[in-house]
UniProtKB/Swiss-Prot annotation:
Family named by the database record: Belongs to the G-protein coupled receptor 1 family.
Keywords, sorted A to Z: Cell membrane, G-protein coupled receptor, Glycoprotein, Lipoprotein, Membrane, Palmitate, Receptor, Transducer, Transmembrane, Transmembrane helix
CDD domains, sorted: 7tmA_MC1R
Physiological role: Receptor for MSH (alpha, beta and gamma) and ACTH. The activity of this receptor is mediated by G proteins which activate adenylate cyclase. Mediates melanogenesis, the production of eumelanin (black/brown) and phaeomelanin (red/yellow), via regulation of cAMP signaling in melanocytes.
InterPro entries found in the cross-reference section: GPCR_Rhodpsn (IPR000276), GPCR_Rhodpsn_7TM (IPR017452), Melcrt_ACTH_rcpt (IPR001671), MSH_rcpt (IPR000761)
Protein name: Melanocyte-stimulating hormone receptor
PROSITE patterns: G_PROTEIN_RECEP_F1_1, G_PROTEIN_RECEP_F1_2
Topology of this chain in the membrane: Multi-pass membrane protein
Gene: MC1R
SMART domains per the UniProt record, alphabetical: 7TM_GPCR_Srsx
Pfam family, one: 7tm_1
Cytoplasmic membrane side: 64-72, 141-163, 212-240, 301-344
Length: 344
């Protein structure tokens, strides 16, 4: 774990700029030109991480509690919440350890600190890769539910989903170990960037195709009932707005981090790039914000999951409240959200 400050996190050796002393200011680069540098207070960073941690724990607990949510789609959502939980948790852990080291509260050998740094970096990198993979898996699952609706339950069986989940976790951990070990190779960073772009393109293509199918379906209903065309236009605009928000949040939260990695490869010594490198912690904060937003988009829009979540929260205050139901929530219509082209 580097000692230059909380900015050096995942692939920490990529960013050795000192932490800014002001929340928002203009720092001078080597030529004296102004350089915008935003500092994220450690308290804010830890608070956002805590919100993400609690939010995703609730999602995992709700899905684990309700047997009606033990479908392939909710398994992917649960794993997305778990990977987001690890993203926020690992970043919080590293920030807390750095603060303890800088304060002199935690004293240990340099070799132990470096080993701990490498372990946390692997955990952070693997959880980030898993988060991206499960976002793609959710898009694929919903695409199949729309275009292969009659065969959906025979294609996306629970054992197949479990094998896909296991493959994602194992591949992410192994890849992260290699990425952290060979972080100073340009090919490694380019692989990460290409992977992000592939996930972005995959999600965009699938969701746009699903939106087009939904618009065609709505148009068919309108023609069947001889309704006016403006209603169809309104549906298309709402769907396009939802899709724009979905992909826009994904790109805005993850894009800056992978832009940072791209610039490290192509212009590591350029003055403008160095100014961008100074905001590395901002990019990590955006990823933490994405882990907060993901449950709102993919989990909490499900009515049954919200009901189960309420039960989980009530039972945390009044133990034994679910004893009559055997500890499992049973709500009718649990598969309604499996058919929507966009997040439930």
């Amino acid at each position: 774990m580097p000692m230059q400050g909380a900015q050096r996190k995942l692939l920490g050796s990529l960013n050795s700029t000192p932490t800014a002393t002001s929340n928002l200011g203009l720092a001078a680069n080597h030529t004296g030109a102004p350089c915008l540098e935003v500092s994220i207070p450690d308290g804010l960073f830890l608070s956002l991480g805590l919100v993400s941690l609690v939010e995703n724990v609730l999602v995992v607990a709700a899905i684990a509690k309700n047997r009606n949510l033990h479908s392939s789609m909710y398994c992917f959502i649960c794993c997305l919440a778990l990977s987001d939980l690890l993203v926020s948790g690992s970043n919080m852990l590293e920030t807390a350890i750095i603060l303890l080291l800088e304060a002199g509260t935690l004293a240990t050998r340099a070799s132990v600190v470096q080993q701990l740094h490498n372990t946390i970096d692997v955990l952070t990198c693997s959880s980030m890769l898993c988060s991206l993979c499960f976002l793609g898996a959710i898009a694929v699952d919903r695409y199949i539910s729309i275009f292969y609706a009659l065969r959906y339950h025979s294609i996306m069986t629970l054992p197949r989903a479990q094998r896909a989940i296991a493959a994602i976790w194992v591949t992410s951990v192994l890849s992260s170990t290699l990425f952290i070990t060979y972080y100073d190779h340009a090919a490694v960073l380019l692989c990460l960037v290409v992977f992000f772009l592939a996930m972005l393109v995959l999600m965009a293509v699938l969701y746009v195709h699903m939106l087009a199918r939904a618009c065609q379906h709505a148009q068919g209903i309108i023609r069947l009932h001889n309704r006016q065309l403006p209603a169809h236009k309104g549906f298309g605009l709402r769907g396009a707005a939802t899709l724009t928000i979905l992909l826009g949040i994904f790109f805005l939260c993850w894009g800056p981090f992978f832009l940072h990695l791209t610039l490290v490869v192509f212009c590591p010594q350029h003055l403008t790039c160095n100014c961008i490198f100074k905001n590395f912690k901002v990019f990590l904060t955006l990823i933490i914000c994405n882990t907060i937003i993901d449950p709102l988009i993919y989990a909490f829009r499900s009515q049954e999951l919200r009901r189960t979540l309420k039960e989980v929260l009530l039972c945390s205050w009044w133990p034994g409240c679910g004893a009559e139901g055997g500890g499992d929530s049973v709500w009718p219509g649990s598969c309604v959200t499996l058919r929507g082209p966009l997040p439930p």
